[in-house]
């Protein structure tokens, strides 16, 4: 297995089928950040059959001299619960980036650290993922927000009708201006 640079089509095909896909790991977000002075790199871990099994958008910023740092917004598109896969991805990524003078990368993976029920009973504890990342050399910086509210809705039209009128108008205007919404 090795890390290679993916073209936009390869990255888009992989990211569209991945369960952790998000707007910050997209070509559109990369193009937006390119206007803010970042260089975009689409990197993927391929197996022996040339199948992509992990990928990331890496935003590159030059530091002084020949050195660079990278930022992977919302983490990698990989199964963080598969410790051997994340280990291989990290080792190969370090090798790949070292040859291009990267001194560090920053990422903020979208991992639910702890999930509580509505009555604040711990339902799921994923601290083992954080511990595994620490073993691989990642430094954990505590998240500043305490809770993220997730609204589970089966009917998108009902949810939309419950929005304030001004929010519905803003959504309508955005769609008319070409903003696309992905689920």
Where on the chain are the PLM-derived regions?
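Short glycine-/small-residue-rich flexible loop motifs, especially phosphate/cofactor-binding loops
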Residues: 12, 30, 94, 130, ...
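Hydrophobic, Leu/Ile/Phe/Ala-enriched alpha-helical segments that form helix-helix packing faces
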Residues: 15-18, 93-97, 133
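Charged, low-complexity surface patches
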Residues: 85-86, 122, 163
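Aromatic- and acidic-residue-enriched segments that line the glycan-binding/catalytic groove
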Residues: 119-128
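N-terminal charged segments
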Residues: 4-48
